[in-house]
Amino acid sequence: MRTLWNHFSTISYIKISPRMRRISAANLISNRNLSTISSTEDPELRDFVGFLESLKNYEKSGVPKGAGTDSDDGFDLGRMKRLMLRLRNPHYKYKVVHVAGTKGKGSTSAFLSNILRAGGYSVGCYSSPHILSIKERISCNGEPVSASTLNDLFYSVKPILEQSIQEENGSLSHFEILTGIAFSLFEKENVDIAVIEAGLGGARDATNVIESSNLAASVITTIGEEHMAALGGSLESIAEAKSGIIKHGRPVVLGGPFLPHIEGILRSKAASVSSSVILASNIGSSSSIKGIINKNGIGLCQSCDIVIQNEKDDQPIVELSDVNLRMLGHHQLQNAVTATCVSLCLRDQGCGRVTDEAIRIGLENTRLLGRSQFLTPKEAETLLLPGATVLLDGAHTKESARALKEMIKKDFPEKRLVFVVAMASDKDHVSFAKELLSGLKPEAVILTEADIGGGKIRSTESSVLKESWIKAADELGSRSMEASENKTVLGSLKLAYKILSDDTTSSDSGMVIVTGSLHIVSSVLASLQH
């Protein structure tokens, strides 16, 4: 194996193995200053975004060790409670569903929000990160908050925010201030219920100021190996941190499936605060994917039967046939089942308008940017990729890579594949690569870079990613792979397209898969706007 280095870009030539064809290390030098905030943000929000950017942003810099644990190293939840008190505790004015979990939070929250909306309820949803605009993080009734509404609220509470920052000696963070604004906006918009997604862990997350009195239910979707250092270094400590959102006397819906001892940790916490447990992966185990259909005006969907059974006698509580989910994969079916279980929990609490039909409509109308998202033919053509099939999926952990791999194997078993990958520096690059390479045989893997949280601090250099993928291939028995030059995310897409197009011996046009981070997805979607 020999590697040649150009002063401005990475050009690696590595011999090809029989099982793999190419890995391309793309050094994104000419696009390294791409920032989601600066390139795609609404110009009306300049003051608001500038205010937030003046604060400590852990999405950009990385989270300190142990910061998400319920320990002396954890974030100080007291300062968030004091901020909420200064804002007159807006989060006490409506019911809340609090959602935590390693993977599946965003999809589950979106499914649930749409189910409630289909039932006629006014719904607020707070999530992170955003893809194109910070407005996406705070939505009311299915739409991101408008710039004018956000500005009006910001200017009205700005003196309180400034006073709070001063009294907390500048320690309030970007996420804490934004969380306070979200809670305030939901009060202003008079929502019936808010679906609140935890940012990191649970116990010490800024969202964990919700009290039992207005908590409708807690939800823990999955437990996996992400943010390990910030959450204590083990699956057990991660489960402990996320179980911190379980509140006294309020039900908790567990997504899963979980390892038995991890489920035990969550159940133990629930028992200690007299919280009833609904295990979605158990009572929804009869749910299944029937096949993939191409629905006019919508695109690819997976047709599913969703069956939720009574835990005591296995009799169906909900039985929905041919539900067309717009996000693909068994993991998305599980997220839909989890959201359905939460909606049934709310129905039992008096939300009678959450009918079976509302559940169906809500599930079928849910789509999220960067989650099993296929570009339309027009979007592909806009990126100068005419006729290409392009899948955007923000998978960035071993577990989400496995889910992506299984979806591709099941739904597109004969497709020729090229991956375009960029990742954050705090992810397990080798494990991610091994998951994708262990069950798939891509024509090429093109490695590039994308800004993380609007900055470069947490972005992984493509040359580092290249070494991780080579190591993964070596551990799987593929000795070496060929690499070629590229500089930008868009250039990487064009190279992927060229690799697939140049093979005239195949009638299959292939598929380009953009993955490794929601931030590389953001780069692609931002390009469509320009």
From Swiss-Prot:
Residue span of the annotated presequence:
1-33
- Residues where Mg(2+) 2 binds: H227
The record's subcellular location field reads:
Mitochondrion matrix
The record's InterPro entries line, in alphabetical order, gives: Folylpolyglutamate_synth, Folylpolyglutamate_synth_CS, Mur-like_cat_sf, Mur_ligase_C, Mur_ligase_C_dom_sf, Mur_ligase_cen
Report the record's Gene Ontology biological process terms.
Answer: embryo development ending in seed dormancy; one-carbon metabolic process; tetrahydrofolate biosynthetic process
Free-text tissue specificity from the UniProt record: Expressed in seedlings, leaves, inflorescence stems, flower buds and roots.
- Please provide, in alphabetical order, the Gene Ontology terms of the cellular component aspect for this entry: mitochondrial matrix
Instruction: Please provide the record's keywords in A-Z order.
Output: ATP-binding, Ligase, Magnesium, Metal-binding, Mitochondrion, Nucleotide-binding, One-carbon metabolism, Transit peptide
Q: Which family does it belong to?
A: Belongs to the folylpolyglutamate synthase family.
- UniProt name for this protein: Dihydrofolate synthetase
Q: Which organism is it from?
A: Arabidopsis thaliana
**Name of the gene this protein is made from:** DHFS
